Amino acid sequence: MRPEGGDTPVRVVSAYCHAGEKETPKQEAKMAHLPRIGARMAELIAEEAAGGISSLVCGDFNVVRSEADIKNWKPNHNKRAGVLDEEIAFLNQWVDEGWRDTVRDLAGDVQGPYSWWSWRGQAFVNNAGWRIDYQYATPALGERARSFEIGRADEYAERFSDHAPVSVTYEI
C-alpha cells in the first residue's frame, strides 16, 4: 500500500495464528505454524535491511509476549495455550531479530494494554485481558510509530468481538 499523500510504499501483512489447546493436535499445528511465520518475517526484515520495502505484520497471534501482556499470569503461565514458554519464545525471537512490537514500544513497561477479553465471567468488566493482537513493524517503519489506540468498548454490551481493534499511527 502507499500511505495517503506519500510515495513510500509499505507492505501490510495480515496474520492469524489460531489459539491452540495445550497438549492437543491443535497445539501441535500451532507450533508447526509459528516457525513458518518466523521464516516469512525473516525474509521481510532482510528485504528492508537491503534497502527494500518496509513491512507491517499485524493480527491475532493468540500468544502473549510477557507477564505484562496478561492480567492473570500465574494461573495461566505454562498451563494454557497462548501463555506457554515455547510459544512466547517465537514472538520474543522476532523482536530479538529486529522487529518492533510497536504497541509495547509506545506503551512502555506497563501492564497491558490488553486487546482480548474472554466472553466468560467478568473478564471484560475486571479488565482481566490478554495482549495477543500485534503490529510488528520492520525497524525503519517501527521508528515512525507515533501513537496507538486499543478500541476497547466502554461497556460489555457494546462489544462486537472478544478482541478490540489495535490501531497505530505511523509518520510516513
What residue ranges belong to the model's regions?
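Active-site regions of metal-assisted phosphoester/phosphodiester hydrolases
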Residues: M1-I172
